[in-house]
Each structure stands twice: as C-alpha cells, then as structure tokens.
Amino acid sequence: MTPTLTPPLQWQRRHVLSLQDFTVAELDIVLQTALSFQEVLNRRTKKVPTLQARVVANLFFESSTRTRNSFELAAKRLSADILNFSPGTSALNKGETILDTAKTLWAMGAEFMVIRHRQSGVPHTIAAEMDRLGGQVAVLNAGDGLHEHPSQALLDLFTLCQLYDPRQPRCALLQGKKIVIVGDIRHSRVARSNLYSLKTAGADVHLAGPPTLLPPEFADYGATLHWTLEPALADADIVMTLRLQRERMDQYLIPSLREYHQHFGMTHERLRLCRPDVRVLHPGPVNRGVELSSALLDDPQFSLVNQQVSSGVAVRMALLYLMGTYHGVKP
C-alpha cells in the first residue's frame, strides 16, 4: 500500500533540485509521505510495487556511501529497476561529456536520474536538457558542489519533526525552536539546504563556526551568526554538527583538528549549555573527536545520527514516489 495524495496535496514538481523555494505545504507533503513509507519499512514485507518497471539511474560522479546506498535501497523498496553509473569505468574516460552520458541513459529508458557532482549546478543543467528533450525524466539533486543537498535536509527535517511527534511529523512542530548548525558552513551544501528548509518551517536558526568557515554574508539567509560556540548553544533545542573536511587544514582555514575540536567540538560538557532535552545531529560521515566526541556520538540519549540514516530511506522513497506522481505513477 502506497500513499494516496488528495487534491490539495497534489505534487507539482518534476525535479527536486533545491529547497530554496519549497513551501511549508510542500515540506509537509514530503513528511507525511515519508511517514507512510516508514510504516512500509517497518513491515515484514518491506517492498511496494509503486515504481515497478520504472528505471532509476544513479549518477554519482562523486564518491558516496550513505547517500548512494540510501537512494539505491529506496528505489529497490519501490520495486524500480536500477542503473548504477560508475564514472571510473564509463565513456567519460574516452571524452564523453556529462550531458551526453545523461542523454545516453535517457535513451536507454531512464525515467529518474539521481545525480551527485562536485560542481554546483550539474543536476540543474541535466534537468534542463531532459526538459528540452521532452523525455519526462525526473531529476533529483543528490548533492552538487557547495550548492545544495535537498534530500539530506529533508531527512533531517523528518528526523526532527518525528522527535516532537512521531505519528504526525509536520513543520509547525519546529516553529520557534532554536536550532544551531555548527562547523564548516562556508563549504557545506548540507547547511544551505537545511537553512532553507528550517527557516521555511519557522525555526530560529543559528550558525556557529570560526570566521574562516562562517562568512558574514550567511546572515542574509536569515540566520544568527556566532564566531564562538558557547553563546550559540545557550538554550538550544537542537545542535546540528557538520563534517569538517580535512583539506581545510591544508588550506590554512583552521590551525589543526585538535584546536577545532577544542573550540567547536560538541561534548557532553558543552551540551549543559543547551536545553535539557537537546538532541544532536550529524549528516555523516563523522570525524570522531573532531565535530563530536565519541562518547556523545554513541549516546542514544542525545544522538540522533542513527535515526537520520534510517529516516533517509523513507524520505528518499517519498521523493521518488512524489516525483513519480508528477509523471503519471498511480498510487
């Protein structure tokens, strides 16, 4: 059994490329649909025929473990046929362009393209080309450069809303909640997508990080900026830490990983500054002892990291299903 969308909840997006212009109603549709698929995943038979005989192509031009496997499992749970593209063994090595690769997969019958690339805008370019071809292909951005990572932010949103109401997750639950995002904001596509979704949901978003990783222009997103961690954590409801890419140390953006943890790493001691019922998120992979202490990461009283991973499959099933309804998939 798959969700049935009533007329007020009809999905109107062919592609999911950015969360910048998502409405509260659209976010709530994703949350409600993900809840339905979470119920499917909790059954003995964890599969529905929703996308049976439909072709989902995973084009990951950048390495990934969690996101790629999560999308692949989501497509399998929907009974889709899956094409996994591997750039290392593809015609890209022979000079083929990315657009030509996408058009080749379209010609083979791909109806959904899940795309990750290190350059910002690649999924948008492919989506525009698919629209030009009139092929009814749905494109989902699985992370593009420093731009966005919509499905990660949506699974974070689902995880948070379920924290406050497991049976009816909705954006209104985050109204006025103080959510602190800590780390390398400058280079984080996860931070950007979360900023869009959390602000739309009505959360009070704060950003914390060293000045080299948190430029002042991020105030334009409607967030409060902090260049020291302790003031940001005061009475926080949620703390979301971001992975620190080790190459930032090579670029002299931070003195050392040890010093970063000393000033911006989350520990049980720092959680005392937050509300007693605070919870901690991280998109993964985690650098233990850098963004989070191992003790905090493994503490189920505070850490929602495993719940985020579990939520990811249901949310990505929801996105593929919803995009499919735009293209004629029947509930």
Curated annotation (Swiss-Prot):
Pathway: Pyrimidine metabolism; UMP biosynthesis via de novo pathway; (S)-dihydroorotate from bicarbonate: step 2/3. One of its GO terms (molecular function) is aspartate carbamoyltransferase activity. L-aspartate binds at residues 94, 189, 243. GO terms for cellular component: cytosol. Pfam families: OTCace, OTCace_N. It catalyses: carbamoyl phosphate + L-aspartate = N-carbamoyl-L-aspartate + phosphate + H(+). Keywords: Pyrimidine biosynthesis, Transferase. GO terms for biological process: 'de novo' pyrimidine nucleobase biosynthetic process; 'de novo' UMP biosynthetic process; amino acid metabolic process. Its EC number is 2.1.3.2. Carbamoyl phosphate binds at residues 66-67, 116, 149, 152, 284-285. The keyword Nucleotide-binding does not apply. Catalyzes the condensation of carbamoyl phosphate and aspartate to form carbamoyl aspartate and inorganic phosphate, the committed step in the de novo pyrimidine nucleotide biosynthesis pathway. NCBIfam families: asp_carb_tr (TIGR00670), PRK00856.1 (NF002032). HAMAP family: Asp_carb_tr (MF_00001). Belongs to the aspartate/ornithine carbamoyltransferase superfamily. ATCase family. This is Aspartate carbamoyltransferase catalytic subunit. The gene is pyrB.
